[in-house]
Amino acid sequence: MAAITAALIKQVREDTGAGMLDVKKALTEAEGDVARAKEIIRAKGIAAAGKREGRKAQEGTIASKVVETANGETGYAVELNSETDFVAKTPKFVEFTEEVLGYAVDADANSADELLEAKAGDTTVKLAVEEAAALFGEHVKVGQFAKISGEHVEVYAHKKSAEMPPSIVAMIATDKACLLYTSPSPRD
């Protein structure tokens, strides 16, 4: 069994985002094997995330992107929700939202359901979101998804405040328009 040092605990914490005690328990259970400890943490995190699934996740952020296509342009927008704005505004959450958007673009997804089944590295977006829920310690879900195509597409992203990521995104194509917003809606 390898010695479980503070440096080893720190390394696994940075890689997984898990708490110090959880990392120490996982390393002890894995007899110092870092890869096995990470797998134990991931499995426990996904199990815990499943328990949070019934909670409301209505805070969040929206990422959007316009890409050129053979017939013009296509705009994609993905809303990723968490339980609190505290999590939604963290750089890691915003970065993960951008990653999910990238998976939508790569898969040329047409709906949130298609996005959840899309490849995310060596897994699916659905499993990546479950792993993110374990990392953030909150229920995380893909909220709204929109795709719009036309000769030309423009996107407007609105922030509720300067420190928050976009919470309202409007996309307009030469002959169509759509609007995404995080809850509560501007109409509430």
Locate predicted features:
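N-terminal assembly/interaction segments in proteins that build large macromolecular machines
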Residues: A2-S183, R187
